[in-house]
Amino acid sequence: MEIAMNTRGLLDQLLKSGQDLLQNKGVARQDGGKTSSSGKGGLDLGSLLSGAGGGALAAGALGLLMGSKKARKIGGKVVTYGGLAALGVLAYKAYGNWQQKQASAPRGEPQTVDRLPPAQAEQHSHAILRAIVAAAKADGHIDDRERQLIDGEIAKLTGDVELQGWLDRELAKPLDPAEVARAATSEEMAAEMYLASLLMIDETNFMERAYLDELARQLSLDAGLKVELEAQAQKALEAVPA
């Protein structure tokens, strides 16, 4: 079913919130209403969520999706992606490099999210946001308590009740890479969804890496395109100051 929501604005805020996320050193997990303070993941949830700026609010939502340790460990990826257009540019570069290596005739200019009119960009954004939420669940850290916290932060970012309800349902449903992949209606969209999932994944975590590999399979990503997407993500990440 096609859903008329404005996911593009929310997604752009989330993708641009990486600097705030890093400045606040991520988000602590909640356990029985108490903020955890482990060595690597002991971070101040309250100070981040009470940030007045939209960037801080978006960082709070993104940090909760990631989980405290992961937010601190891979928060640089968020800075790498910048915003929605930046993600599209990375997908465009990867797709272009892959096309150049194909023996077959060129398929034309890649239609990534940064090059699309609003209606099509919204469709891509919807699929990308679905991929981000699913990837966030891959390590199993989102319980009912954290889901409520995420819902609260999303409500601060958008007044779109339909979008809020859709996100809550996405968070609540069982993780199913095949179902996520069905949102992709083009190779470019599949590439963007995989890149967005890379953003949320700690590739050293077995569960998350297994999810990512299965998502690539369900998206029917060509092995060469998958390599190019991962190379673009890594190259951009290496350019982020430590």
Residues of each region from the PLM?
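Acidic, glycine-anchored loop motifs typical of Ca2+
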Residues: G140
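Small-residue-enriched hydrophobic alpha-helices in membranes
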Residues: E2-R130, R147-A242
